[in-house]
């Protein structure tokens, strides 16, 4: 009896240890709530907070959560009807962030998810379900008491708009605008304009099920810039000379 019990427990433990991460659900885009702010501690966390951007939505959707801590992901919105239809809620915003040393500098990527990318109201060419946009802030050293801002890059379709002197508040918080030049879809630019900060969720503090959901979900024509597969390629493109 004892042998049988031990064998059963061992089998259960082995199965649990080897079990893959459970696939979670695709849920309505407005059913997800922003995760409470969660960033790493220490000097790197301080730098992430110091250079937190302000985002202004000049056109299109407000930012929404893309995923939760159970691995459920947003189903997004069809790119039809009003360009802001179903995605006007200003209380849903979430900023995703990842930081790390790269090529002798420190990079912080701040990213936002929008349920659809629709350059104009109606059924127009160029729109699509899901949109991911981001900026990269380049510092000399996040472990310094006062890191130096070396430049920044804003996502622009498949590339970046780069600058050594992005518009900022207090010299550290980049001012970022989400906009479109019809008929092209949305992109980001650095611009002096009103903006908001949103709760930040750091890649370093996310559970594995959330990281897995971000990495394995089919986001259509959009892609998550800060997952492992995209992190360094994006930083290469976003480099500021």
Predicted feature residues:
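Short beta-strand micro-motifs enriched in acidic
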Residues: 138-142
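Fungal secretory targeting signals
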Residues: 1-23
């Amino acid at each position: 009896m004892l042998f049988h019990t031990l064998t059963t427990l061992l089998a259960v433990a082995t199965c649990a240890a080897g079990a893959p991460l459970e696939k979670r659900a695709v849920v309505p885009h407005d059913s997800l709530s922003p995760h409470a702010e969660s960033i790493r501690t220490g000097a790197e966390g301080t730098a992430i907070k110091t250079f937190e951007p302000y985002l202004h939505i000049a056109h299109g959707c407000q930012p929404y959560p893309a995923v939760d801590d159970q691995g459920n992901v947003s189903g997004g919105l069809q790119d039809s009807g009003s360009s802001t239809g179903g995605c006007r809620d200003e209380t849903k915003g979430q900023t995703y962030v990842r930081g790390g040393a790269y090529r002798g500098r420190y990079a912080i990527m701040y990213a936002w998810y929008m349920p659809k990318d629709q350059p104009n109201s109606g059924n127009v060419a160029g729109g699509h379900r899901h949109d991911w946009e981001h900026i990269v802030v380049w510092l000399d050293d996040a472990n310094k008491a006062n890191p130096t801002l070396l430049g920044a890059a804003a996502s622009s379709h498949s590339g970046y708009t780069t600058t050594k002197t992005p518009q900022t508040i207090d010299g550290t918080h980049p001012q970022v605008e989400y906009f479109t030049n019809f008929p092209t879809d949305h992109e980001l630019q650095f611009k002096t304009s009103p903006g908001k900060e949103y709760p930040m969720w750091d890649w370093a503090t996310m559970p594995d099920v959330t990281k897995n959901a971000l990495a394995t979900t089919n986001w259509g024509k959009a892609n998550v810039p800060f997952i492992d597969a995209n992190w360094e390629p994006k930083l290469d493109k976003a480099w500021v000379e």
